[in-house]
Amino acid sequence: MSTVTRDAEGTVTGNTYDKYGSTNPVVRRLMAGFERTLDELLGRAAPNSILDVGCGEGVLVHKWAQAHPEARIVGIDLEAPDIQAGWAQHQAPNIEYRINKAENLPFADGEFALASAIEVLEHVPDPAHTVAEMARVARGGHLLVSVPREPLWRGLNMARGAYLKDLGNTPGHVNHWSKRSFVELLSRHGEVVEARSPFPWTMVLVKV
């Protein structure tokens, strides 16, 4: 089951669905490809510090902290009860969580070896500015980002009868990219190292 989530100001921020813990065999198959690609690209960057922008309940942050206990890992997201409850469940000595918007990151230039935004940029009002901020705090390192691949994503929603009044648009998605247009956006901020297409997403590693 999925639910619409809102931040402390009442703005729709997304459609919460535990895709990482789903027992649905189709979702599990899709997520296996997604996580495998994510792990491979993260391995290419081999960062010793990570800022995860829009970390949600902290599932990925916690996974990375366990896999890389020597790395400093910071997760930021909006103030929302479900998000902070998730943080309490996903703790590790090398994890730090902060309530903060993606548009203005309270970190120094080049403070992190990698900045990630996994299924986040489709939600933010100014994605180009958010990417620029991420590139600033990861200067000399990498960005690792993923978004739904359009128009495939909306087509799949409509095929299963979801969000028909909004032509398949998932609640909270205010930005939409094909693989090509997303790579073009990121290439303005650094060198695209690799762009992958785990169905039905686009995932890109960028050297900044």
Question: What name fits each language-model region?
Answer:
Residues D126-P127, L156:
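Conserved catalytic-core motifs of eukaryotic protein kinase domains, centered on the activation segment
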Residues S116:
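A conserved beta-strand element that flanks and buttresses the S-adenosyl-L-methionine
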Residues H123:
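Histidine-centered divalent metal-coordination motifs
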Residues A128-H142:
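A short glycine-rich, Lys/Arg-flanked "PGG" loop and its adjoining helix->strand segment in the class I
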Residues M1-A108, V131, G161, K165-L185, ...:
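Conserved N-terminal segment of class I S-adenosyl-L-methionine
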Residues L144-D166:
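Conserved class I S-adenosyl-L-methionine
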Residues V120:
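Hydrophobic adenine-recognition pocket in adenosine-nucleotide-binding enzymes
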